């Protein structure tokens, strides 16, 4: 199931990139999403910047049909591989993620680019729940949970961009 989101910031692409690759920002985002525990790493790999976030979450608001797959908690692991900036400062990232020990995966791209006087951060994900018969029924719940987390992260990004 496809998930597309974007947020606009009163900042340059370089400033938005600095925010999304800041360990403290990612840790605050984990706290905003009520992670029970988390691990954030930001590292360089050649000209790429790799952001890996692993967060343990309570499995609340999970449909009964999914509860047997996740238990009381779930661990969400997301990796963004941000590529070198283009001449205009824009950047793209490959995004991959999973809910550990479940048949849930996500894959897609993210982009930071100038749009007039603002900068837009956009994400385009394909979320899959690989469970015969019920996977397609579970995907909307997973997408809604991811959308909620991304919205909290975008809201926090606005706070950071305003500093």
PLM features per residue range, with description:
Residues 1-59, 64-65:
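Hydrophobic ligand-binding cavity/cleft-lining segments
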Residues 16-20, 123, 157:
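Hydrophobic pocket/interface hotspot
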Residues 49-52, 76, 81, 89-143:
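Beta-strand/loop substructures that line and gate deep hydrophobic ligand-binding cavities in soluble
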Residues 63-66, 134-136:
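Short, charged, solvent-exposed linker or helix-capping segments at domain edges/interfaces
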Residues 65-73:
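Extended Gly/Ser/Thr-rich low-complexity repeat segments
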Residues 69, 87-88:
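Low-complexity, acidic/polar, glycine-enriched regions of mature
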Residues 71, 77-79, 83-84, 135-163:
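A conserved amphipathic terminal alpha-helix motif
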